């Protein structure tokens, strides 16, 4: 996969990233970047923080150079609608305008859903904290290197408010 250029959108504000770094040794975007580089060492990866206007302006001026965009998970709640959250949603809208291929994970999916005109509602019973059971990898997924030597049916932690 030579010449693959991916943009990762960090889903956390600085304060939340610092907590994540303290716990894991890297930000959410850096963890994802490290995983992608392990799977495909030749991929070019850039990280953008939607709350940093200078970064956003620079990235949008070169958005057509990216093969795809990955929106990470994060600790914010989209329905809080802070200025920072609005910047994330606006950035997703800009990516849509350029017809970029997008992978949105957790928080990123909520941001992209709102940017596309959807609705994200708070959980009716509060936070969901538990285990997603019997997650099954489909035939295409079974061929992906990420699932090499892994079970194709598994349980995983699940946590979200919205």
Sequence positions of predicted segments:
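A short, acidic/glycine-rich surface segment
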Residues: 54-57, 119-121, 141-145
